[in-house]
């Protein structure tokens, strides 16, 4: 039976109030239209006016979309997050890596998108500070507010914040206008197009913490709390900053104060130190979060705090709170069936929970900085994160983007490692690459001295020597065993390893589909080989499989009209493939028994079929159409196999632990579907129907 995931928006406007700070999600009321990347006349004349937005500070001389007098009545109504690429057709000439969607430099007419939003600020307090925060726009985003040019962010993955306080209309509508240009790709995977992450209206006091400016550091029983404080008032200010650490129940654990003297426009950092004898530690099994109350000039801001230690070393791999933890991880791109890159927060949480069900405790954000929502969710759910930089380099632009990632991630206990790059083939064997890596690593340590850095290596032997922690992309590419023998002091983990997955439910070759490599591939390129290696070598930190969930783009080894990668452990809708049960058996204590393939093999009657079982039972017995095929001992981290001639009917597997029957799994040949059965699950602001 086919299953369908339907995502329904149930809340389009949300406000998150944190004491004096209010963050309002700007979700509904947006207008959208395509511009044009090659023809200014079809791009609403943007930038071609006699006085354009770069020559004069306001668009009063323009009739373009950033002008209040512009008529957008013919534009589409959309909600944000929004990925316009999902609505575009496919074409064989389009980008293979981006899933053959007609977006990119070949398609100027569908690669620029314009957004307009009217915001009512008639009740805004003139004594307060207001900013707009965009968690991510793909890409090359230009922002105007009430006709004033706010700025341009070329990266599709950077959080961008603009002070709008001086430009507010308190007696009329306020116009927010955004132009996004997705002509160029930043990655080699589907990236979407448009305002694909959340947009926030942020209200604070005039003297306030900077965005991402409240952060903590736990070292040797002492919690250092810091608040980078900005003075956006017109007066010199003696800013009194008070900190209180509270339990989940609101009990005060510690408190302290500091003062920073700030001239108008100046920024300084207040801090305090709390000695905490027996903190409740944040852990993957108990993701406990304190609350830090920071009061600045009478305004209070609340920040989640997770206290924990995390380190990688050469002897034990990864240690969390002083004990060895094996990272059971997956790589993850940010896109999903139906919504593309514009994943609502509730769906992000649902995806993480589906992965946790099979034992996943770690996610590598491949290959770009995570959306802030994912970090918040993993803080709450107890999943550790490797946050990854998009583009290696050491000039001002590269460092700005690197700092953006670190500032937004350093307060999250889920983040345990900063990745400065991935498979940089042009640098991996070049001494210049080593210099770049060293300078990037030093800069990260300056911004965050509490975490190590990593580099995901495709096989080169020069650049990745500089990384604190060596990330091996595939055992077969990196000669891991010999490198460990030569350099036992190196700290290492599997940053990528193959899942060997294919199209869910496909077991024989057919056009546009990919049977699992695990049943047809070489022993060096299957999921069992990857897990067994990292399980049996405790000096490694664990492994991150490629990938946790199918994603659009990179349909290798297939090509058009196939458009998504099928190496995910879960398919594009989040349904588990056979390999999900293999990992669940290996990674959890819950008894697992799973038979493959399915038993609807029309056209293969009378053929010998290899029937596999994934399980963590001690022994499994299999019968086919009532015939006992035998009872076998289950190899740890492996599979069992029986040969059965296909005949419509029934397969029954029985699992035994310590000689006692604990599980029975039955699959059988089915006829045509007679009805559709749907169930719903609501997570946050979305409902999933399957």
Where are these regions (language model features)?
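Solvent-exposed, conformationally flexible loop/turn segments
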Residues: 171, 220, 263-267, 606, ...
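Beta-strand-rich domain onsets/edges
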Residues: 671-689
């Amino acid at each position: 039976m086919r299953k369908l995931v339907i995502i329904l928006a149930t809340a389009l406007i949300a406000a998150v109030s944190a004491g004096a700070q209010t963050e309002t999600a700007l979700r509904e009321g947006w207008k959208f239209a395509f511009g044009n990347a090659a023809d200014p006349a079809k791009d609403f004349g943007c930038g071609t006016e006699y006085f354009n937005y770069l020559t004069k500070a306001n668009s009063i001389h323009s009739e373009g979309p950033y002008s209040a007098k512009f008529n957008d009545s013919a534009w589409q109504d959309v909600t944000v997050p929004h990925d316009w690429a999902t609505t575009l057709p496919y074409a064989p000439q389009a980008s293979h890596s981006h899933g053959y969607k007609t977006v990119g430099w070949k398609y100027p007419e569908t690669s620029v998108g314009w957004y307009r939003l009217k915001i009512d600020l008639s009740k805004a307090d003139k004594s307060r500070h207001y900013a707009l925060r965009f968690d991510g726009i793909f890409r090359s985003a230009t922002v105007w507010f009430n006709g004033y040019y706010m700025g341009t962010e070329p990266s599709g993955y950077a959080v961008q914040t603009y002070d709008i306080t001086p430009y507010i209309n308190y007696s009329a509508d306020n116009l927010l206008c955004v132009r996004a240009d997705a002509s160029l790709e930043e990655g080699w995977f589907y990236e979407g197009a448009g305002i694909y992450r959340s947009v926030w209206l942020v209200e604070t006091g005039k003297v306030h913490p900077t965005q991402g400016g409240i952060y903590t550091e736990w070292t040797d029983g002492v919690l250092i709390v810091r608040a980078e404080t900005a003075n956006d008032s017109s007066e010199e200010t003696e800013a009194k900053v008070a900190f209180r650490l509270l339990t989940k129940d609101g009990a005060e654990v510690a408190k302290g104060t500091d003062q920073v003297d700030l001239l108008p426009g100046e920024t300084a950092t207040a801090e305090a130190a709390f000695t905490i004898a027996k903190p409740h530690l944040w852990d993957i099994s108990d993701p406990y979060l304190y609350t830090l109350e920071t009061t600045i000039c009478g305004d209070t801001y609340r920040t989640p705090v997770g206290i924990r230690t995390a380190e990688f070393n050469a002897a034990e791999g990864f240690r969390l709170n002083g004990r060895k933890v094996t990272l059971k991880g997956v790589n993850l791109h940010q896109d999903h069936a139906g919504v593309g890159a514009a994943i609502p927060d509730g769906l992000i949480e649902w995806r993480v929970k589906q992965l946790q069900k099979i034992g996943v405790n770690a996610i590598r954000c491949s290959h770009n900085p995570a959306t802030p929502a994912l970090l918040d969710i993993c803080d709450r759910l107890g999943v550790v994160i490797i946050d990854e930089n998009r583009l290696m380099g050491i000039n001002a632009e590269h460092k700005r983007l690197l700092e953006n990632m670190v500032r937004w991630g350093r307060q999250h206990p889920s983040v345990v490692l900063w990745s400065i790059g991935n498979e940089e083939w042009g640098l991996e064997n070049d001494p210049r690459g080593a210099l770049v890596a060293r300078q990037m690593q030093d800069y990260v340590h300056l911004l965050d001295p509490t975490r190590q850095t990593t580099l995901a290596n495709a096989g080169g032997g020069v650049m990745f020597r500089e990384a604190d922690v060596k990330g091996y992309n595939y055992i077969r590419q990196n000669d891991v065993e010999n490198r460990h023998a030569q350099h036992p002091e190196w700290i290492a983990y599997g940053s990528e390893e193959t899942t060997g997955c294919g199209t869910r439910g496909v077991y024989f070759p057919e056009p546009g589909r990919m049977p699992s490599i695990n049943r047809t591939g070489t022993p060096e390129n299957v999921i069992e080989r990857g897990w067994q290696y990292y399980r049996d070598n405790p000096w490694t930190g664990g492994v991150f499989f490629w990938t946790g969930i199918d994603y659009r783009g990179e349909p290798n080894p297939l090509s058009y009209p196939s458009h998504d990668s099928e190496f995910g452990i879960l398919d594009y809708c989040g349904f588990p493939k056979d390999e999900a049960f293999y990992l669940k058996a290996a990674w959890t204590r819950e008894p697992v028994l799973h038979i493959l393939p399915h038993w609807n093999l029309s056209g293969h009657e009378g053929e010998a079929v290899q029937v596999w079982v994934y399980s963590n039972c001690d022994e499994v017995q299999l019968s086919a159409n009532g015939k006992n095929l035998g009872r076998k001992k289950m190899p740890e981290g492996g599979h069992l196999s029986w040969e059965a001639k296909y005949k419509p009917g029934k397969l029954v597997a029985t699992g035994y632990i310590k000689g006692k029957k604990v599980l029975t799994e039955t699959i059988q040949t089915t006829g045509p579907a007679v009805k559709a059965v749907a169930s719903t699950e609501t997570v946050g602001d979305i409902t999933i129907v399957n």
